[in-house]
Amino acid sequence: MAILTSKASNIPYPIQYDELHKEAVLQKHFDTASYLSTTHTTRNTMRYFLYFAYDGTNYHGWQVQPNAVTVQLRLEEAMQTLLRVPTPVTGAGRTDTGVNARTMVAHFDTETPLPDPAVFADRLNRLLPPDIAVHRCVPVTDTAHARFDATSRTYKYYAIDHKSPFAERYAWRYRGTLDFDAMNQAAEALYRYTDFTSFSKLHTDVKTNNCRVTYAHWEQEGEGYTFTITADRFLRNMVRAIVGTLVEVGRHKITLDEFCAIIEGRDRGLAGTSMPGKALFLHDVTYPEELFL
């Protein structure tokens, strides 16, 4: 399902596509064998970055896990069908259950260079379900890594204060009023810190909870407010925990000083609740130019 934004609203909404049964797609649109049997005869491993979007509503997050349908699972299934060999993909990050992505990046390797990455992206799209859409496929250096080479990631969180049959699927609806000026003052305080243990999911496998936040701001857009945050990396559940704590500032339940004390306390139990994942979008991921061929 492709994700677009209405001109009159800051809230993303889905464009519906007709369902195509996978076998019918293969029969009608593909000749995989002829696609792979090209003039490229030398076996030369190539790495590619895949840029794609997804609606996370029906998925248990990005990463493959037992007994669950995930975005990575569906993508790797489609890759194997198209390339006819198991093809693992490595994502730029791990979004949680229900979280969406306007731009996710993943890398994968092929033993034979793709004849035309644009054609590959188009054919992969035809195999994927309607709620996953590939934007483009680009060749990169052999050592380029979608996760470790990312220089920044940007997330957006959408909030509305009224009932909307179109927006509520991808936005958090709040009751009463929020002091967004106070929330932005607290958001600016994030620049002064690097240890965000208080906003991290417990018992994760990361070696450090240090991140460098370079932008964090609430802005009125269309019919609601959008929180945009950019950092070099994010911890599990970090953005939703930050938003939940900023909401407590906006409701005057805690002061700016108390918000800072929560960060300095390095204790997840001090921070606010984790906000619903449906309103969170991975918006962009950036990389050094030298990675691209």
Residue ranges and their predicted role:
Residues 18-34:
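Positively charged N-terminal leader segments that act as targeting/secretion signals
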Residues 1-13:
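Extreme N-terminal basic, low-complexity initiation segments
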Residues 7, 32-40:
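N-terminal polybasic/positive-inside topogenic patches
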Residues 15-18, 36, 96:
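Short, linear, compositionally biased motifs with a strong N-terminal bias
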